[in-house]
Amino acid sequence: MLYLAEAQSLTTASTDLTDDSVKVHTEIPKVEEKANPIPLPEKNIKQTEKTTDTLPSIEYDIEKLPAPVKMMRQKIIDAAKTGDVNNLKPLLGTSGDPTQLSVSDNVKDPITYLKQLSGDGDGLEIMAIMIDLLNSGYAHLDQGDDEEIYIWPYFVALPIDKLSKPQLVELFQIMTAGDLEEMKEIGTYSFFRIGITPDGTWRFFITGD
């Protein structure tokens, strides 16, 4: 099991990679919406809940994923299992449409950034987190519109204080009970999550509320 507490203890010095110091923690600095061109899933979930009481569908069956999504998921897992974070680089989008790794969207070197997020400094911890997330259940959000996304883990789409005991067991595979209590204070799941669009684009790997 990977512990968020270890990731939270990581604070790196300011570098030329981002405008601010790179830190791994549960919360993300609040930024203006215009600074974040990729809509975050929580915003869409809250908007949906205003008009319907229906929760997003939760799935475990990988075969139900569209072929491009299933392929990208497997590519991320395979790259992470190599133990070399550089193998993720071809999957992280292009300079014109990069995978979002930070809410402020100011990451200049994604591989170095991922290494700095990782407690070991080589990206191994971060890759293990990716594998754990992609082996969990997923949610299908915003079906049929331009922001449609498949997101791991599905906890992002559910009220964090309403999880069943079996769901909590799943949650504790990627974080601790102490982390859960902190998230209850925030009111939402705030650990890492991965989003892949229906066409197989790796849209984001971010953390925060």
Named regions from a protein language model:
Residues L4-T15, P29-R73, K89-D209:
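C-terminal-biased regions
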Residues I76-L88:
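Short helix-adjacent coil turns
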